[in-house]
């Protein structure tokens, strides 16, 4: 059973964007570790941040509503709009979410250390209206200035692109890749930074094509005035010593002699799973000739139980020299055109 983000924020499933913002503001103030000293506060603060990041983003919310937490984080929501798989991973830093929401400032420095002039404590302030109005802050935590940059105006940094090279064997069987990234994260004050390493786990599905994109939303560097960039990995095929790839087909080049091309031969054709398939070639091998072994290629991405084909191309080796008597025999028996 996945997390119920609506329950975490204390709202109904049909809540509006404004309801989500108000709920996050209330819960974030309630469970912020600078105020709430209970042992569970830090974990609740993190859950609230994750719930807000999902429900405040229309695409992530749509996927979550349809597939739940497992579908959102497992890539069940289809593509990212660029042909890649969309999957969400929470960045793990609720303080960065808090700082971005409240404009990169720390409102706790203002009112958590003392009671307000009107006599209300912080618990009352989170329940009643706008807790920051007395300090010149708007409801989203930004100064009341028409020229200020609020969350609705933040722009996301361009995606950070990485190539992810995989072998044909890995595409054939599927595999798991763990990629280490380093990024800057905002501290709780919303101004200073710290370096942070993170391991991103990528499930390579059977048959994925070169160019497939895997997107980790907002895993890039954090800054006070922009949304972190998405980290995007693009699948690239490694060169293979035996095979070339053609979509879901693979191509093997069999080297044979001129005599074998004319008189026939038997060859062993290797496969990606380590077997050898014997093949008899009785026809004359002509330029461009191919043979096909059905079902021995790569899995189809959308139907991995079915596979493409193994294509055999022939490369004929010609002798460097030939004797006069052999030439005479060839002239006698081979057609002139």
Swiss-Prot record:
Give the principal location in a single coarse category. cytoplasm
Superkingdom field: Eukaryota
Q: Which GO molecular function terms does the record list? A: ATPase activator activity; protein-folding chaperone binding; unfolded protein binding
Q: Which UniProt keywords apply?
A: Cell membrane, Chaperone, Cytoplasm, Membrane, Phosphoprotein
Listed GO biological process terms: chaperone cofactor-dependent protein refolding; negative regulation of transcription by RNA polymerase II
Q: Which residues form the J domain?
A: 2-70
Any one Gene Ontology cellular component term annotated for this protein: plasma membrane
Sections of the chain in a coiled coil: none
Q: Which residues are reported to carry the modification Phosphoserine?
A: 122, 148
Subcellular location(s): the record lists:
Cytoplasm; Cell membrane; Cytoplasm, Myofibril, Sarcomere, Z line
Q: Sorted alphabetically, which InterPro entries does this protein's record hold?
A: DnaJ_C, DnaJ_domain, DnaJ_domain_CS, DnaJ_subfamily_B, HSP40/DnaJ_pept-bd, J_dom_sf
Keyword Calcium on entry: no
What role does it play? Probable chaperone. Stimulates ATP hydrolysis and the folding of unfolded proteins mediated by HSPA1A/B (in vitro).
Query: What interactions and quaternary structure are annotated?
Result: Homodimer. The C-terminal section interacts with the C-terminal tail of OPRM1. Also interacts with SDIM1.
Q: What is this protein called?
A: DnaJ homolog subfamily B member 4
Query: Which organism encodes this protein?
Result: Pongo abelii (Sumatran orangutan)
Name the lineage. Eukaryota, Metazoa, Chordata, Craniata, Vertebrata
The encoding gene = DNAJB4
